[in-house]
Amino acid sequence: MEVTSQSTLPPGFRFHPTDEELIVYYLRNQTMSKPCPVSIIPEVDIYKFDPWQLPEKTEFGENEWYFFSPRERKYPNGVRPNRAAVSGYWKATGTDKAIHSGSSNVGVKKALVFYKGRPPKGIKTDWIMHEYRLHDSRKASTKRNGSMRLDEWVLCRIYKKRGASKLLNEQEGFMDEVLMEDETKVVVNEAERRTEEEIMMMTSMKLPRTCSLAHLLEMDYMGPVSHIDNFSQFDHLHQPDSESSWFGDLQFNQDEILNHHRQAMFKF
C-alpha cells in the first residue's frame, strides 16, 4: 500500500483512531484489499527490525507509529506467533481485550513489551506495542503450501513509554511553578496587610478633637500628673499667701497646669 506523505495531509491533521475504528476501517479493509480512509499506515514486517528502527520506516507519526505487519508461526505446525526480533523479543503482558462495534465482537487487542536479549533473561525496555487482529483471524489461519505465515495482516501501534525520571522532572517543574506563584501571593498579601496596619496606626495617632481629663492623664506623651515633679516653672501663675491655703492653692495650680497643657496639645 502506498503511504501518503505528510506534506499532502490537511493542515492540523491528527491520526488518533479508536480501537474500533482501527479494526473496522483499517485492518478489515487491509485484509480485504480495500482502500483505507487515509493511506498513512505502511506495510512493514516489524519483527525484522528493532522497535527504535521502526519510526524511520514510516513518514507519519511523532510519538506513536502504526504498521500493517504479517505474523509468522513459531513452529511449523503450531498457531503461536514468532515474537523474536533482531536484538530481542516482544513479550505479551496482561490479557487480550475484545474490541466491539455495537454488539458485535470485531477484533482483539493485545499489549506487548519489548525485551533486549534472549528469553528468559531479557532486559525490559520502554517500547510498547498494541497488536490488533480480526476476531475471526485464527479460524482463517490455515497452513497453505508449507507456508509459515500465521496471519496475513495485523495492525500494530508502537510507541515508547515516557521514562519515570522524565515524568518526575516535569512534575517537579510544575510544582516549582506552583510554589513560586504561591510565594508571590504571600509576599503581596503581606505587603497589603502591612499597608493596612500602617494606615490603621497613622489613623489611631490622630488626636481627638475633644478629650476628657481622664483621657489626657493617660496619654503617653503627657504622663500622669504625679510625674510632674517640678512646679517651680509655674510659680508665676499663683503665689500662696500662707501655709493654711497651700493645699487648696496647689489644687488650683494643678488645674491651671492641665489647662495650659491642654491648650498646648490642641494647637495643630
Swiss-Prot record:
<keyword id="KW-0805">Transcription regulation</keyword>
<dbReference type="GO" id="GO:0010150">
    <property type="term" value="P:leaf senescence"/>
</dbReference>
<feature type="DNA-binding region">
    <location>
        <begin position="106"/>
        <end position="167"/>
    </location>
</feature>
<dbReference type="InterPro" id="IPR036093">
    <property type="entry name" value="NAC_dom_sf"/>
</dbReference>
<protein>
    <recommendedName>
        <fullName>NAC transcription factor 29</fullName>
    </recommendedName>
</protein>
<dbReference type="GO" id="GO:0000976">
    <property type="term" value="F:transcription cis-regulatory region binding"/>
</dbReference>
<dbReference type="GO" id="GO:0009908">
    <property type="term" value="P:flower development"/>
</dbReference>
<dbReference type="GO" id="GO:0003700">
    <property type="term" value="F:DNA-binding transcription factor activity"/>
</dbReference>
<dbReference type="GO" id="GO:0005634">
    <property type="term" value="C:nucleus"/>
</dbReference>
<dbReference type="InterPro" id="IPR003441">
    <property type="entry name" value="NAC-dom"/>
</dbReference>
<keyword id="KW-0010">Activator</keyword>
<dbReference type="GO" id="GO:0009825">
    <property type="term" value="P:multidimensional cell growth"/>
</dbReference>
<comment type="function">
    <text>Transcription activator that binds to, and transactivates the promoter of the abscisic aldehyde oxidase AAO3. Promotes chlorophyll degradation in leaves by enhancing transcription of AAO3, which leads to increased levels of the senescence-inducing hormone abscisic acid (ABA). Involved in the control of dehydration in senescing leaves. Binds to the DNA sequence 5'-CACGTAAGT-3' of SAG113 promoter. SAG113 acts as a negative regulator of ABA signaling for stomatal closure in leaves, and controls water loss during leaf senescence. Transcription factor of the NAC family involved in senescence.</text>
</comment>
<dbReference type="GO" id="GO:0009793">
    <property type="term" value="P:embryo development ending in seed dormancy"/>
</dbReference>
<keyword id="KW-0238">DNA-binding</keyword>
<dbReference type="GO" id="GO:0009835">
    <property type="term" value="P:fruit ripening"/>
</dbReference>
<dbReference type="Pfam" id="PF02365">
    <property type="entry name" value="NAM"/>
</dbReference>
<keyword id="KW-0539">Nucleus</keyword>
<feature type="domain" description="NAC">
    <location>
        <begin position="9"/>
        <end position="161"/>
    </location>
</feature>
<keyword id="KW-0804">Transcription</keyword>
